[in-house]
Amino acid sequence: DPSGSPHIRILPQETFEDICRLPSDSGDCLRFFEMWYFDGTTCTKFVYGGYGGNDNRFPTEKACMKRCAKA
């Protein structure tokens, strides 16, 4: 974008919820980042390699629960 404005992508509600149904995916690299994913019931810690993977990946348990836990 020549204007230099950031791009904002709006996800449909079903896509938003589907992210939380994806399996944990450590990605394609061999680095070691402790991250959190939603396992269908709760948020669980896993090791992320730093590249690739899917969007069911959060920096904190709180961020994971906020996004995926049902009230």
Swiss-Prot record:
Residues 23-68 form the BPTI/Kunitz inhibitor domain. It is found in: Secreted. It comes from the Eukaryota. One of its GO terms (biological process) is envenomation resulting in negative regulation of voltage-gated potassium channel activity in another organism. One of its GO terms (cellular component) is extracellular region. SUPFAM superfamilies: BPTI-like. The record marks 22 as: May bind Kv1. Expressed by the venom gland. Coiled coil: none annotated. SMART domains: KU (SM00131). Disulfide bonds join 20-68, 43-64. The record marks 30-31 as: Reactive bond for chymotrypsin. One of its GO terms (molecular function) is potassium channel regulator activity. Residues 1-22 form the signal peptide. Keywords: Disulfide bond, Protease inhibitor, Secreted, Serine protease inhibitor, Signal. Serine protease inhibitor that inhibits trypsin at a molar ratio of 1:1. Belongs to the venom Kunitz-type family. 03 (sub-Kunitz) subfamily. This is Kunitz-type serine protease inhibitor HNTX-852. It comes from Cyriopagopus hainanus.
